[in-house]
């Protein structure tokens, strides 16, 4: 179910991000975890970045070829033995386990030169830590790539999916349950090496 979620700010000072379904489309997606929480078991959610290639040609992110019409997702994870940067894990969770229903995404077009900004960020920040979790990692990468007009701002020191969802309210519409089915196979980067 594809839809748009309109924030309380719509019609006031909400901003619209330019996003055509062509070129490179960068997205930040967040899921607050509430629908997956159970009594005595809290799900804190997850946040990740997506890159959708609609350029008409193959682009490269690190050593990953992304052919036209395909996409890649990535974020840091606290997976046992793999506290690094994982690629295309989220689409697997969505397709095989029905996870992240109700996820919210904000998207904008970027230039191919911004791929270098993403790669540099990945080189410097390829690990999950308690204070630099998936939400912290994703929002800082997003802000480094998109610039001030599309930057997301949160309050407080701890970055969570719920705070990113609140930051989305600065924009007039956000996509609900974005489709990530065109992503590839799962792999990991840790200490600059692909595994």
Kindly label every feature range from the protein language model.
Residues 43-46, 127-162:
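Active-site nucleophilic cysteine motif
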